[in-house]
Every structure is written in structure tokens, then in C-alpha cells.
């Protein structure tokens, strides 16, 4: 698809489909066939002849963003796709699947860099859209929340959920996080009915979970309304699964804001 005089958009379907419709769970991992890879190479050859730059868009990640999420999230044959992208000097891809605002960069054997940018899922708080500006030799990327409330007011939409969209979506997100945390407690055998500290654990994890999906570092202000932080962390350390603890540590260690303006040059 032509974006402007200089750029083409290349939409790639990496999903795997069942021959038996509606039976069993869908496949989560993704793969590009050898036929598709050859077609991609041909498209890049054509673009090169016409002096066009290509922006590839794909569901599965072309670079691993988190080691714990490599299986089923990074394209099964991402290395083969990256070989083509490095060959033609493509510096970035747009992908999704992990639902979290993030970017990850990989370096080729001859020191070329390629960045995979994931825009957070529009269906979950804070409902990001990506804004991309183009020049002849660079793009500027930034993620920002959709201004749904402004649109609802401008168009006289009276639906209360749309007029207070941010708070509505945050409530849904927090509710989902609470269910995840209580599931961890119950499955791990450390849920105790009527223990008030467990609700604080759920609030604490919900705040961290929000920071992860929003692509922002956790700020002390995000936790200021949660008392007993040390007790909460100790309870988690003593009882939660290794995966759960590692997930929270990864969020606490992050110092990068993945929504900030990012410039990528050819």
C-alpha cells in the first residue's frame, strides 16, 4: 500500500489457521512460509528499483521484547524475516501481539540496527494509537491515548462510558488485574479469606501491571495510596510463583518510557 511518494506499507499475516474451524484453541505462535518470505524479498527488490522505502507491519514480534514472552510471541522464523530486512536496510517494523507498549532493538552481524515497535493494544487501557510522521529519510513515532472523551463531547455523544472513556477503561483494566492476582493466590494456596492485606496486594500488582502495558516506568506516585508496601512485597516473595515474581521485578527495574518520541533514520 502506498503511503506517500516515498513510502510503502507492507502488511504481513503471520497467523496460523486451523483447517477445522471452531475446534480447539487457536494457535498463538506465528510463522511466515517460505513462499511468503520469497514474495517479501521480491517486493523489496521492486521497492528498491522504484526508490521506495518499506514499512513492514506484522502481528507477531520480529524481535524478542521479553525473554519470558519469546515462545509464541516472537515470530517462529523471525531470523529469516530479519535477514531480508537487514539486506534491504529496513530499520524498523511495527508489530503487536504482546499488547504492551514497547520497543526492542537487535543488531546484525555487520552492526546494522533494527527496531521492532509494539503499540499497546487499543482494546485495553490506556488505549494507545501510534502517530507516525514521515520525512524522506526518517520517521518519527510516538504513542498517545485516543482522545475518545473529546470526540464524544464534540459529537454530542451521551454514552457515559465514552464521555468518561479513560476512567471506564482503567476500571476494566484494574478489574482484570485483580482477577489475575487472586487467581495467582488461589492456585498458589496463599489466599486467605478476609485478609485485608490481599486486597492491597491486588492493588499493588494492578499498578505495576498498568505501568507494564502502558510502557512507562513505575513511579512512586503510582504507589502512594497503597500502604504496607514492604509487607506486600514480602508476602509475594514468600508465596508467588517464580514467573510472577520475575514479572513484577522486570516492571520495577524498568526506567524507560516507551511512549516518548522516537526518531528512526534510514
Identify the residue ranges that each predicted region occupies.
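Non-catalytic terminal accessory segments
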Residues: 153-266
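His/acidic metal-ligating clusters that form di-metal
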Residues: 8-11, 23-115
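Active-site-adjacent helix-turn-beta-strand microarchitecture at beta-sheet edges
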Residues: 1, 103-124, 129-136, 143-145
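Solvent-exposed loop/turn segments at secondary-structure junctions
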Residues: 15-18, 60-64, 98-102, 121-124, ...
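Acidic/polar loop patches that form or flank catalytic/metal-binding clefts of enzymes
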Residues: 93, 140-142
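Active-site-proximal beta-strand elements of phosphoester/diester hydrolases
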Residues: 6-16, 20, 57, 115-120, ...
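Short acidic, gly/pro-rich beta-turn/loop elements at beta-sheet edges
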Residues: 20-22, 66, 126, 142, ...
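Acidic/histidine-rich helix-loop elements
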Residues: 18-32, 150-164
Amino acid at each position: 500500500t502506498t503511503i506517500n511518494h516515498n513510502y510503502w506499507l507492507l502488511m504481513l499475516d503471520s497467523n496460523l489457521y486451523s483447517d477445522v474451524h471452531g475446534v480447539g484453541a487457536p494457535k498463538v505462535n506465528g510463522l511466515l512460509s517460505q513462499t511468503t518470505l520469497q514474495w517479501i524479498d521480491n517486493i523489496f527488490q521492486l521497492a528498491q528499483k522504484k526508490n521506495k522505502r518499506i514499512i513492514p507491519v506484522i502481528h507477531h514480534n520480529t524481535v524478542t521484547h521479553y525473554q519470558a514472552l519469546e515462545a509464541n510471541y516472537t515470530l517462529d522464523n523471525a531470523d529469516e524475516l530479519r535477514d531480508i530486512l537487514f539486506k534491504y536496510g529496513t530499520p524498523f517494523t511495527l508489530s503487536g501481539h504482546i499488547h504492551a507498549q514497547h520497543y526492542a532493538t537487535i543488531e546484525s552481524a555487520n552492526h546494522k540496527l533494527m527496531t521492532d515497535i509494539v503499540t499497546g493494544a487499543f482494546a485495553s487501557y490506556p488505549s494507545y494509537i501510534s502517530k507516525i510522521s514521515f520525512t524522506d529519510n526518517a520517521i518519527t513515532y510516538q504513542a498517545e491515548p485516543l482522545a475518545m472523551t473529546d470526540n464524544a463531547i464534540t459529537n454530542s455523544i451521551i454514552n457515559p462510558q465514552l464521555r468518561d472513556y479513560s476512567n471506564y477503561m482503567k476500571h476494566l483494566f484494574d478489574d482484570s488485574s485483580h482477577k489475575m492476582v487472586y487467581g495467582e493466590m488461589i492456585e498458589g494456596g496463599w489466599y486467605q479469606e478476609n485478609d485485608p492485606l490481599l486486597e492491597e496486594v491486588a492493588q499493588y500488582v494492578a499498578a505495576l501491571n498498568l505501568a507494564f502495558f502502558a510502557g512507562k516506568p513505575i513511579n512512586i506516585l503510582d504507589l502512594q495510596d497503597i500502604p504496607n508496601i514492604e509487607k506486600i512485597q514480602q508476602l509475594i516473595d514468600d508465596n508467588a510463583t517464580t514467573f510472577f515474581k520475575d514479572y513484577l521485578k522486570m516492571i520495577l527495574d524498568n526506567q524507560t518510557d516507551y511512549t516518548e518520541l522516537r526518531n528512526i533514520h534510514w
